[in-house]
């Protein structure tokens, strides 16, 4: 009985850990999204979002969320799931890849509209792009947390150590290429949240 219990507890622990790195990314991304949402009423009322802050929001969206986090999924998690028989061109992986591409396109538009805003003070398109970006990413993260990751945790429960190492290797490589550290983005998220607290 004890051995079975310990074995089950070990399996449960492994299941939790197989996507822990990605869930940690999600928590950081959601933290930034909430403060991004808090800037929208300010922009609508004509208040100014300082250029350094807005530039960091764009950097986080395009580099941490896309290059780093999506990179971990596309170069590590998804290939591992393919090895377990989950197809790349249909089903959950195909949907996530499509949504990643949508995220990139909206982020690129948001970068362009942020430059327009910083140049002439017109926040009209920036507000539209930020709202679309936040709504899209929030829904995407929910699907991953509550659908894809549950399947991944079951499929990869016997390969946790390998998956964790692969995810960490991709994160380290992507951040090094960006000339950033995870701590840089965590620090930004903390500072951004203090300046623009999430709305209730």
Model-identified regions with their sequence ranges:
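Small-residue-biased structural context
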Residues: 2-200
């Amino acid at each position: 009985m004890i051995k079975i219990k310990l074995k089950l507890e070990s399996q449960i622990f492994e299941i939790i850990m197989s996507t822990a790195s990605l869930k940690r990314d999600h928590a950081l991304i959601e933290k930034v999204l909430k403060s991004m949402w808090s800037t929208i009423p300010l922009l609508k009322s004509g208040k100014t979002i300082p250029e350094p802050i807005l530039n960091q929001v764009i950097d986080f969206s395009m580099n941490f969320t896309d290059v780093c986090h999506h990179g971990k999924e596309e170069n590590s998690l998804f290939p591992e799931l393919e090895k377990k028989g989950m197809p790349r061109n249909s089903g959950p992986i195909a949907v996530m890849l499509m949504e990643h591409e949508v995220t990139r396109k909206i982020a690129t538009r948001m970068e362009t509209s942020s430059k327009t805003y910083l140049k002439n003070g017109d926040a009209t398109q920036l507000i539209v792009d930020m709202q679309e970006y936040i709504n899209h990413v929030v829904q995407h993260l929910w699907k991953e947390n509550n659908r894809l990751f549950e399947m991944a945790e079951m499929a990869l429960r016997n390969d946790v150590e390998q998956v964790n190492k692969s995810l960490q290797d991709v994160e380290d490589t992507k951040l090094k290429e960006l000339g950033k550290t995870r701590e840089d983005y965590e620090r930004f998220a903390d500072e951004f949240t203090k300046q623009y607290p999430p709305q209730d």
